[in-house]
Swiss-Prot record:
Compositionally biased region (Basic and acidic residues): 414-428
Species per Swiss-Prot/TrEMBL record: Drosophila melanogaster
UniProt keyword Transcription present: yes
Alphabetical keyword list: Coiled coil, DNA damage, DNA recombination, DNA repair, Nucleus, Phosphoprotein, Transcription, Transcription regulation
Protein name: Actin-related protein 5
Location in or out of the cell: Nucleus
Amino acid sequence: MAGKRVLVIDNGSYECRVGWSDSKEPDLRFRNVLTKPRKDRKKEAAASEGSASQTTVEQSAEIQVGNDITNIEAVRAHLKSPFERNVITNWNHQEQIFDYIFTKMGFDGQDKIDHPIILTEALANPNFCRQQMNELLFECYGIPSVSYGIDALYSWKHHQQKQKNISDALIISFGYSTTHVIPVLDGKLQLEHVRRLNVGGYHIITYLFRLMQMKYPVHLNAITISRMEKLVHEHCHIAVDYKEELVQWAQMDYYDEHIMKIQLPYNAVTATNAMLTAEQKQEKRRELAHRLLDIKKNREQEKLREDEQQLFVYNKLRQLYEQKKLDKFERALQQQQIGTLEDLDSLIATINSRIKRAQERAQSGPRPSKQQERLNKMPKPPEGMSQADWLAELQGKREKILGRKQARQQQRSEQAKRHTHAAQERMRIISSLAKNEKRRKANGEEEDDGFGMNDNDWDVYKRINRYNDDSDSDADNEKLMQFDKILNHYDANTDGNSNVPPQSAAENYQLHFGVENIRVPEVLFQPSMIGCSEAGLAELIAFVLKLFPAAEQQRLVEHVYLTGGCAQFKGLKERLIKELMEMRPFQSKFAIYESDEPTLSAWLGACVHAGEPTFGQTLTTRQDHQEHGREFFREHTASNIFYPTPKD
C-alpha cells in the first residue's frame, strides 16, 4: 500500500470533485447527474445493421455523464441522479458515474483500480448503503482499500490547518438537499446531538424558479433552472433584517435604484413596413389590389371555360332527345346523374345565364373592390397643397385637439378638489349671481337687464358648470377619429396612440430581479415560505446548543464554522451573528468562521487526511470486507460512527 497515490472522491449530490491527494485542486469537477438521450429511430435502424461489437460501443456511448452533457436544459426532463436527497439509492447510476470517473482519470481499459480511495458519504449513512458501496468498489472495481468520511468534517479538518489547537466547533454544513448542525467536542463528532434541516440549495433554486414563472408566465420557456442557478449563485444574498429590507423594497425610489433587469434572448423583428414612406405604402396597396383583381379575373375565366364545356355536353344530350335516340338519351342521363328532361333543361338555362353574366362583366370591365371603394372615398389633399404639407397640417390639428382634451381632463380633476383655485372661482361666481338682484321700475315691475342678448353672456354658465364640455368633447372626438383615419391611411409612421411612448422589444423580454434576491435564500431561516413545517436554521442552532451544559455551549459557540455551497451567500455571517447575539446570554462571546473555499474545502480536507501518518489505519481493506462483513468500515476523526446492524 505504501507509495501508492490516493484517489480522493468528494461525491456530493450536486457536484462531484475527483483528484489525487498530492494535487492542489481536483483534476475533475462535474455535475453529479447522467442522462440517456432519446434515440433516433432511423439511426437505431441503421445501427442494428452493423456488427455486434459496433453496437456495444454505441450503446456505451449513449449514456452522458457530467461534463459530457453539452446542453443540460435540453435533457433536463431526462436527468438522473444516484442520490435521493443526500443518500445514494440508485446503484446502477452510481456505477455509471464511477465508470466516467475512472475513465477520465486514466484507468480506461484496466482490469482493476489498484489505488486506495477516499470517498465522502452522507452523515449517518445507513449501513445498507455502505454495504452496497463496498460491494461495488471491492468486487466490481477491485480496489485495495477505501476510507469513508463526512464532507463537513473533512472541511473542518482543512480549516484546522489554519486554526491550530482547535478541538471544539459547531459546524453548520449547507448541502444541496439538507443542512446539518454538527457539534464537535474534543475533536469527536457528537452524532447523537446532530440535527438536520431538510432545506438546501436545491430548494432555494426551485423556489426562485417557481417565483419567476408565476411572475412572468409569458416567458415560461426562457425561465430555466440553469438561469435560476446562476442568479442564486451570483446575485442572491441573505438579509440581516429581513422585514426591514422588505419595507425598503416597498418604496419606489429604493426599488428603482436597486432593481436588476435581466435581458432574455429574443429575435428582433425588423419593421420594414414602418420604414416606408406614404407614397411607397400607397403604391404597395395599389399593387396588392391589382394582384387581387388579376386573381379574381383568372378564376372567372376558368369558371367560364368550365361552364362552356358543361353546356356543350348538355346540348349534346338535348340533341339525342330531339333525334329520338331515347335509349342513348336515358343512358347518358344516368351517367350525368340527371333525373328527367325537365332537370336537363333547367341546368342548361342556369348555365346559359351564368355564362351571359360572366361575358357582360368581362365587357364592362372589372368592378372596383370594396378596398378600392374605400380608397376612393378617402379624402384627398386640396388642390395646390402637397400631401406632406396636408398631413402635417392635419397632425397639427390633431395635437391641438389632444391638448384640449388633456386640459379638460386636468380641469375636471382640479374641480373635483374643494381647495383648488378652479373650485374657489366657481363658488365665487355662483355666490355673485345669487346676490345680484334685478332692478325694478317705478310701477314695481322688474326691469330687464338685457342678459342674454350677447352670446358671450352665456359663457358664465360654462364657467360654473363642472361638466360643460360634453358637447365640445364629442365634437373633438369625432374630429380626432377622422384625423386618425386619414393619417393612418396616408402616413405609415403615424400611430393612433402616438402620445404614448412605445415600448421596445428588448424591454418586453426583461425580468426584474428585485426582492427575490433576499426572499429566496430566506427559506433557510423560514422554511415555512416553501411549505416546510420544520424550524429554521436559527431555531435549529438554539435547539442543538440546549442539548449541552452551559460550559460546553460556550465552547461550541466560540468556533462556529460555516461550510458548503450555501455558505457563499453574502450576509450569512452577519445574519448568524445577529441570531446568536439574540439567543446567547448577555455579554457572552462567540465567533463565526467561514470556509475560504466552501465548495472545495471537503476535498482539500480529505487530501489532508490522506497525508496524515495514521492514514493507513483508517483504510478499510478487502480483507476487512471479507472478515468483518460487507457493511464494516474503520472509524476516524472525520468519519461516521460504526453501529453494526443487529442480527435477528
